[in-house]
Amino acid sequence: MCLIYAGIKETTEDIVCYKMYVSSFKGKLVSPYMRSPMPNMNEVTKTRLGKPYGIGSCVDEGFHSFATLEDAISESECWTRHYDCDPIIVRCIIPKDSKCYIGSFWGKTAYCSDSIKLIEICA
């Protein structure tokens, strides 16, 4: 997933977001684009946050998520139609004091952050 960068901020409060996962060939849940394993639920997980690059200022390194459940479901429906899979959507929190890019992915408001906490499977 490549976020089209609009701005960066250090979060001053927790941000609720929604992340999609799909089953891998080995039956594990992974992120759909980078195939990163799904972190443990209810634990803050950190990763490297990439820098914007190229035309449109894409950001591909970090935890990508959607601002609304509706946008995450819309993206998961595309995966269901085109890749014959059954994605899950997880409600997450980008914790306070995280670094977070705000931008868009296929016209949907999205985030790319250096940390995330998975809360519950919601769709």
Which residues are covered by each model-predicted region?
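Conserved NAD+-utilizing ADP-ribose enzyme module
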Residues: 1-63, 67-123
